[in-house]
Amino acid sequence: MKFASEFRDPALAKGLLAEIARLADQIGATAEKPVHIMEICGGHTHSIFRYGLDKLIHPGIEFIHGPGCPVCVLPRARVDECIEIAGRPEVIFCTFGDAMRVPGSKLSLMQAKAAGADIRMVYSPLDALELARRNPGREVVFFGLGFETTTPSTALAIQQAAREGLANFSVFCNHITVPEPIRALLDDPYMRLDGFIGPGHVSMVIGIHPYDFIAEDYGKPLVVAGFEPTDLLQSVLMVLRQISQGRAAIENQYARVVPEHGNRVSLAAIADVYERRPSFEWRGLGEIDASGLRIRAAYRAHDAEEKFGVGYAGQRAAVEEAEGCACGAVMTGRMKPVACAQFGKGCTPEMPLGALMVSSEGACAAYWQYGGARAAE
């Protein structure tokens, strides 16, 4: 299988593990004083556990799981606002499937659907656009959610709706950006991070230079990585080489997919449709300056926040996390999922307490799927 099996070669993986061990010993990394490397992307977290890299790698390397899952960092208040919109009789509310079971303060979208709201799972914002064409008497709202990876497709749907004059199509925009929460983590005096594995899919869109501040301002290395086991091992090795050489740079291990300057067509669509919010709330991190996107005035007719007066366009109420939920601590690397008192007890994939157990990219779901269920017994 071209571009997959080549990156799962056991002999190559063994060689990388040996070189990682040599460098880890050289810089004095031990289980008691490990090198902390944060993998930002939830997809990387799942790959690490799927291939058992956390068990195979030198004990002086510790993976810290970052806030790179857009469903997981969505605060409960935004889920409540989705349900408020979806509960209107004129609305068809469209969402990706992984957002359906994320708990709000009282209900999830799945539970709201069971209670009678017209909520539909779609695979693309273009599916929602087609629903708007077929239902001119209904308001079709797409739940725009995700990092820079999914932001362009939502932008293209908004542009198309504007061209067609589809006034009954709007987007509840929850698109967020990756670099800003990394800065927030680095500014946290309680966080000890020695390097980063940068997100592959996000970087396909934005390129590698938006991360330059990590090396220039904080002196930390970041390596953009692919998702196969040897991709991740090579990225760890590249981070360790920088540390051993006393330097910090942004490097691109995933050069077969990620262009240095990103995807210019996607970036142009993002720039046309969106502008930065002054701040946006992240689960576990609070409000982070300039970390969220909102729809520009030129496309305001397709902005569900403005149309329905919810969210940042209306009166927002603070919503606390569910009692006992430690998602915030897990997403900011302060706690491993199995250290949470609710893991496998009050919080399971069947009955999730927090978003990290729901999403396909959540750290708690990864721990559960790849052996954490046994640890909880």
From Swiss-Prot:
Keyword annotations of the record: 4Fe-4S, Iron, Iron-sulfur, Metal-binding
GO biological process, alphabetically ordered: protein maturation
Listed Pfam families: HypD
Disulfide bonds: none
Family matches, as InterPro entries: Hyd_form_HypD (IPR002780), HypD_1 (IPR042243), HypD_2_sf (IPR042244)
Pathway in which the depicted protein is active: Protein modification; [NiFe] hydrogenase maturation
Binding-site residues for Fe cation, renumbered to this chain: C41, C69, C72
Cofactor(s) listed in the protein's UniProt record: [4Fe-4S] cluster
UniProt key word Magnesium: no
Keyword Glycoprotein: no
Coiled coil ranges: none
GO molecular function: 4 iron, 4 sulfur cluster binding; carbon monoxide binding; iron ion binding
Family matches, as PANTHER family: HYDROGENASE MATURATION FACTOR HYPD, HYDROGENASE PROTEIN ASSEMBLY PROTEIN HYPD
Free-text function comment from the UniProt entry: Involved in the maturation of [NiFe] hydrogenases. Involved in the biosynthesis of the Fe(CN)(2)CO cofactor.
Record family assignment: Belongs to the HypD family.
Name of the protein in question: Hydrogenase maturation factor HypD
Organism: Rhodobacter capsulatus
Source organism phylogeny: Bacteria, Pseudomonadati, Pseudomonadota, Alphaproteobacteria, Rhodobacterales
Gene name linked to the record: hypD
